[in-house]
């Protein structure tokens, strides 16, 4: 049966936390401890942690515990932070500085990934665009003259204030059947002499946060760091269940490609001789349910997310046929892929088919692939059908189950490539 060594599981777990670092800017997710407020953090043992909970309860302190997928827990005190008072016109003055710094400009952000991003501030409106070659997706826009679309506010984090603007009216998101939206945060950053986009994250499906540095905001001390008047509280955390390892090991062995929707594609570097599968995905969001009592809702969401990840693989030319050429949406093919968690453990095996313009994706019982210790996506296509007859193995879901995604290809491939991200 297909197994991961302890070292590889540990390696992938640390790498997943490293790759997902900073994945939330304004929302608190519970996937990694990096999403906690930037207070003082101290690591303690499990016994000391339990004693801290008991003593805090006895003393009547306000606190809560965050549980993370790496097995660690954090004690977070619920003490309101005192910020320096601000002038009533601070938001108005800040917006004026932002406008003066960005009007008539187009800021571009080209991370090491498939998509690039643009922030455009014209005389009439502001827009945020996701693009690749000739394909564009509108993430959000704001008409300056329309009070209904202008949504800006003065916000604060642990150390300073910033300006937040929310753009609606993005392109339709097929998964949510709603328009995309993006929040743009304008911040003072002393180490950036020009107006630049610092980051863009999709913190939820079709919901984005863009971080823009506006150096002129630093002229107003309230937007600078360290405006908090009281010292930070201490957050106490237990150690992760996954031991640390050298991140260089993963970099030497695999090339991770972020596909969106919680998925990474892991491909061995071309200069290596090992034959690990190229049809291998890593999923770092909530795992799919494993008990029979679950109503299948999360499983259905996982299928939708994995379908989008496969479509992204297809669009990027990372799914190849036996001839070495990339599959295309016009062809008919089947690909089997192992899906692992951030700890390297096997979550499931998925089957992805395109047949006569229809996309079909479902789970396959992992045990049916126990003879496939090595191979690539072409081997899966050739070998798996022989092992998947109905007498030897059953699919985890039948065709009328919501966990099977069966849609027409044109719902994913549109002229604007709206649904591929």
Swiss-Prot record:
User: Which is a Gene Ontology cellular component entry for this protein?
Assistant: endoplasmic reticulum membrane
Ranges where the record places region Disordered = 375-403
Q: Provide the topology term for how it sits in the membrane.
A: Peripheral membrane protein
Name the UniProt key words of this record, in alphabetical order: Disulfide bond, Endoplasmic reticulum, Glycoprotein, Lectin, Membrane, Signal
Residues annotated as glycosylated are 125, 271, 332
What the protein does comes down to: Lectin involved in the quality control of the secretory pathway. As a member of the endoplasmic reticulum-associated degradation lumenal (ERAD-L) surveillance system, targets misfolded endoplasmic reticulum lumenal glycoproteins for degradation.
Family, per entry: Belongs to the OS-9 family.
| Protein name as it appears in the record | Protein OS-9 homolog
Organism (species): Eremothecium gossypii (strain ATCC 10895 / CBS 109.51 / FGSC 9923 / NRRL Y-1056)
Q: Which gene is the coding source of this polypeptide chain?
A: YOS9
């Amino acid at each position: 049966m297909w197994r991961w060594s302890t070292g590889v599981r540990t390696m992938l777990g640390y790498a997943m936390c490293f790759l997902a670092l900073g994945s939330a800017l304004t929302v608190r997710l519970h996937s990694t401890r990096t999403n906690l407020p930037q207070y003082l953090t101290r690591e303690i043992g499990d016994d000391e942690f339990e004693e801290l909970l008991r003593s805090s309860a006895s003393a009547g302190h306000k606190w809560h515990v965050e549980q993370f997928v790496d097995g660690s827990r954090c004690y977070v005190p619920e003490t309101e932070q005192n910020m320096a008072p601000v002038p009533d016109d601070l938001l108005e003055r800040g917006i004026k500085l932002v406008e003066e710094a960005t009007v008539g400009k187009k800021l571009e952000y080209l991370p090491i990934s498939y998509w690039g991003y643009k922030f455009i501030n014209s005389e009439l409106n502001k827009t945020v665009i996701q693009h690749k070659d000739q394909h564009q997706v509108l993430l959000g826009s704001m008409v300056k003259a329309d009070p209904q679309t202008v949504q800006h506010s003065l916000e604060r984090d642990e150390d300073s204030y910033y300006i937040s603007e929310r753009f609606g009216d993005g392109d339709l998101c097929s998964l949510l059947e709603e328009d995309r939206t993006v929040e743009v945060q304008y911040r003072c950053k002393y180490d950036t002499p020009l107006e630049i986009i610092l980051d863009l994250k999709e913190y939820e499906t079709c919901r984005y946060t863009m971080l823009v540095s506006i150096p002129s905001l630093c002229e107003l001390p309230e937007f600078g760091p360290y405006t908090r008047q009281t010292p930070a509280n201490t957050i106490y955390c237990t150690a992760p269940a996954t031991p640390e390892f050298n991140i260089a090991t993963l970099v030497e062995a695999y090339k991770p490609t972020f596909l969106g929707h919680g998925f990474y594609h892991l491909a061995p570097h071309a200069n290596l001789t090992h034959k690990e599968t190229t049809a291998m995905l890593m999923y770092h969001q909530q795992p799919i349910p494993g008990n029979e009592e679950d109503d299948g809702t999360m499983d259905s969401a996982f299928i939708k997310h994995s379908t989008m990840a496969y479509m992204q693989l297809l669009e990027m030319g990372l799914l190849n046929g036996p001839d070495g050429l990339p599959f295309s949406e016009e062809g008919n093919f089947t690909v089997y892929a192992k899906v692992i968690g951030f700890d390297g453990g096997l979550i499931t095996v998925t089957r992805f088919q395109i047949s006569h313009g229809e996309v079909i994706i479902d789970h396959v019982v992992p045990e049916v692939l126990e003879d496939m210790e090595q191979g690539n996506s072409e081997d899966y296509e050739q070998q798996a059908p022989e092992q998947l007859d109905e007498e030897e193995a059953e699919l985890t879901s039948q065709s009328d189950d919501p966990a099977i995604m069966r849609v027409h290809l044109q719902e994913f491939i549109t002229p604007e490539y709206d649904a591929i991200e």
